[in-house]
């Protein structure tokens, strides 16, 4: 959502947020749509939409990990790849990996590794591919939610179901599920 400079300045002068720009309460989330099985040829897949953000995740595996020197004899390996499609934002982004997408891949891998139990799959790999075709705000959150659903859809054992939400701060007030205008105006998620 585009927010003119005048509106941003007005929000700052008035101490911001007696209510949020889109009318939500501070702790209210945007409408969400979650679906599994969106890619029939995948071992597991899901899509997650909130506000103007959509993420899709595909799971492949468990399958034998090659090269063999990367295998773990005690448990399987989880690999996560996160990417934003070039047309996902107003300012077209360069296709392919970026430092930001590699960092988010590692954060998602770390978060998902804490709940996934691959002890029953030694010497294997489970690959999770997250793509964001439409970005408003909270892309890593949408990606994590889609990935967790795709892992469950693939039947990968998990200790618990992972969920994520973006929280921002405005004038000492916490805002749950920040939108693009809030994210740009403050130090929000990303």
Predicted features and spans:
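Polyanion-binding surfaces on beta-sheet-dominated domains and ring/shell assemblies
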Residues: 1-190
């Amino acid at each position: 959502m585009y927010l003119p400079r005048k509106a941003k300045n007005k929000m700052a002068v008035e101490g911001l947020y007696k209510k949020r720009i889109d009318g939500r309460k501070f702790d209210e989330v945007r409408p969400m749509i979650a679906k599994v099985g969106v890619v029939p040829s995948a071992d597991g897949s899901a899509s997650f939409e909130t506000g103007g953000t959509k993420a899709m995740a595909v799971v492949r595996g468990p399958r034998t990990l090659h090269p063999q020197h990367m295998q773990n004899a005690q448990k399987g390996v989880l690999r996560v790849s996160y990417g934003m499609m070039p047309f996902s934002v107003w300012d077209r982004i360069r296709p392919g990996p970026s430092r930001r997408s590699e960092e988010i891949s590692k954060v998602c891998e770390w978060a998902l590794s804490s709940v996934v139990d691959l002890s029953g799959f030694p010497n294997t790999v489970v690959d999770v591919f997250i793509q964001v075709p439409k970005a408003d705000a909270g892309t890593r959150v949408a990606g994590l939610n889609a990935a967790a659903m795709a892992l469950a859809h693939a039947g990968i054992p998990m200790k618990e179901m992972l969920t994520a939400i973006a929280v921002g701060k405005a004038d000492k007030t916490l805002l749950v599920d920040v939108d693009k205008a809030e994210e740009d105006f403050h130090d929000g998620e990303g």
